[in-house]
Amino acid sequence: MTEFVGTGQFVQLSAHSLEQLSKGVLGAINCNDAIATFVARHLVQANLMGIDSHGVVRLPQYVEQVEADYFSPAGTPVVTRCDRGATVINGGRGFGMPAMQLAVETGIAQAKANGVAALGVTNCGHTGRLGAFCETGARNHCLTVILGGGARRDWRQVAPFGGSKGMLPTNPYSFGIPGGERGSVILDFATSVGAAGWIYAAKSAGASLPEDMIIDRNGHPSQDPQDYIDGGALLPAGGAKGYGLALLAEIVGEAMLGRVTTDMNWIMIVIDLERFQGVNQFSASAEAILAEMRECPPADGFSAVEIPGEREKATAKQRQRDGIPIPQQSWEQITAVAARLGVPVTT
């Protein structure tokens, strides 16, 4: 999902100007320069790829969470345990993006040494776009899997299949694997019909939601983002299938990794593909599989069969050239936060 229904005016901005503004806002809430730079770049990259729900629209939310002491912008991740391929990383109550970056870098090194690595990531704030970390694994010829859960006490966002109120978080999954000549194949999805971030982004943009995405607090279907905010719930993706995936992630997040202290807990699995097939043989086989998919005649209403991750790459090229569209209402909220923090805004 990359568009909202009924969105109004947009402001077109360069990636550089958005990154500088984001870095300024993050610095103003006590991020050190390295963390501010990394998180700002991560957010803008999400916007470039068309994943606007995980882009700069998150800045007001992050500021609000820091001011409420939900997480610490100065927190830094550390490896607290490493035992025979099983590693635990404590995010230090900081932003989740640096914790995930430490996890994937550690996981790649361990997978290259041992074939496989499993890493738990705990005690950190929002982790951003999970696909970014799976891309890092894929570039290093690894299969990377990430899933998160355990936060249902704080985030009862998704109704279980057959239920009428929110009981589970959106418990996202991401997978990344090399894909041949055109780059990696990346899957990154919430176990709900859409990510909760899309709802807040839609509200910020003054937009309505697609049908069959949320229910209101009484269990009735709705397209109004406010109905979700006022106690409604997202629906599980694919009905029982999305519910089952979410429930599994919830058990992993808490029963396996311990009670959540900040946001949610994560498990990352990294596998060195060279332990199974050489790089050239793998790439040729993957390319042949993807070529078969692309040759499939498109159904009515579609121009072509796409490979997961390719649309985002194309969007990034276009937005790098033409600028990133930010809904006017979202931009006003971001600039209001920046002004309150004394951060200059340039476009």
Model-derived regions: residue spans:
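Active-site cofactor/substrate anionic-group-binding motifs, chiefly glycine-
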Residues: H54-I108
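Acidic, glycine/proline-rich low-complexity segments that act as flexible tails and inter-domain linkers
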Residues: T2-S14, Q20-V39, V44-Q45, D52-Y70, ...
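Solvent-exposed alpha-helices and their adjacent loops that cap or buttress functional pockets
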Residues: V79-C82, A111-A113, A138, K165-P169, ...
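Catalytic-core signal marking the mid-to-C-terminal active-site face
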Residues: T2-L21, M256, V260-T347
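Small-residue-enriched flexible segments
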Residues: A195-G253, L257
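A generic, well-ordered mixed alpha/beta core segment in the N-terminal half of proteins
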Residues: A86-G180
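Phosphate/diphosphate-binding glycine-rich loops and adjacent basic-rich segments that engage nucleotide
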Residues: R153-Q223
